[in-house]
């Protein structure tokens, strides 16, 4: 959810995330994937059995995690009634793509559902995305339903 125009959900794209991250001191290496209305962008190399260490979530997690940025802002709005119809649709599209990506990553790297977490759960990260209400009441149930099919 870095560097996205909050008021224009139809413009939530992974290329905006990449451009925003690329301009930072760490040169865009703070996440493995960006997901937006334009699809999934891979920002760091992935290898069989291992991933490139990234920066961003917190040192304890950076060495052992795959990080995904979802384009947009205020995903909790979808569940609190504050989202416009365009915002809801954008979140639904981005969520569906992210769920597909997470399932592939879970299968490839033997990641359990308990180890799929939001940035807001990382102590000291200072991040609130994608939003605890959204993640716990929408994303995780959708992910679990897809895994059980």
Residue ranges: model-predicted function:
Residues 24-27, 34-36, 52, 57-63, ...:
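Extracellular/periplasmic catalytic domains that process cell-envelope and extracellular macromolecules
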Residues 49-54, 76:
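A short local loop/turn or secondary-structure capping micro-motif enriched for an aromatic residue
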């Amino acid at each position: 959810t870095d560097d996205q125009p909050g008021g224009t959900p139809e413009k939530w794209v992974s290329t905006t995330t990449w451009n925003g991250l690329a301009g930072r001191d760490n040169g865009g290496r703070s996440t493995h994937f960006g997901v937006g209305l334009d699809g999934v962008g891979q920002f760091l190399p992935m290898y069989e059995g291992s991933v490139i260490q990234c920066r961003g979530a917190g040192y304890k997690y950076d060495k052992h995690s795959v990080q995904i940025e979802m384009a947009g802002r205020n995903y909790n709005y979808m569940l609190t009634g504050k989202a416009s119809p365009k915002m809801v649709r954008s979140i639904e599209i981005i969520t569906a793509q992210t769920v597909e990506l997470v399932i592939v990553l879970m299968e490839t790297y033997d990641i359990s559902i308990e180890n799929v977490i939001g940035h807001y759960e990382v102590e000291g990260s200072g991040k609130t995305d994608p939003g605890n209400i959204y993640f716990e009441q929408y994303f995780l149930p959708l992910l679990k339903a897809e895994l059980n099919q």
